[in-house]
Amino acid sequence: MAKYTIVDKDTCIACGACGAAAPDIYDYDDEGIAFVTLDENKGVVEVPEVLEEDMIDAFEGCPTDSIKVADEPFEGDPLKFE
């Protein structure tokens, strides 16, 4: 089943946990705030199946619950959480 991810940049504390768990999915802006590299944090590009386990590790390891994961794209409402 398809999975999508987005980072709530308002609650991200720039701890680096998501990039450590899933460096092929998450990166950081100039202030250290995480974003999804697959689609510039829009949550509309399906996470490749081979990266889903890393995405879940990042999701579960985020201390502020800023990593969001959904079965559908976040289109229209970028902070629609599952």
Swiss-Prot record:
Q: Which UniProt keywords apply?
A: 4Fe-4S, Electron transport, Iron, Iron-sulfur, Metal-binding, Repeat, Transport
Q: Give the binding site residues for [4Fe-4S] cluster.
A: 12, 15, 18, 62
Q: Which cofactor does it need?
A: [4Fe-4S] cluster
Database matches in SUPFAM superfamilies: 4Fe-4S ferredoxins
What's the domain of life for this entry? Bacteria
How, per the record, is the cofactor bound?
A: Binds 1 [4Fe-4S] cluster.
**Pfam families with a match to the protein in the record:** Fer4_13
Single GO MF annotation: iron ion binding
Q: Which residues form the 4Fe-4S ferredoxin-type domain?
A: 3-31
So what does this one do?
Ferredoxins are iron-sulfur proteins that transfer electrons in a wide variety of metabolic reactions. This ferredoxin may act as a phosphodonor to cytochrome P450 BioI.
Q: Under what name is this protein listed?
A: Ferredoxin
Gene field = fer
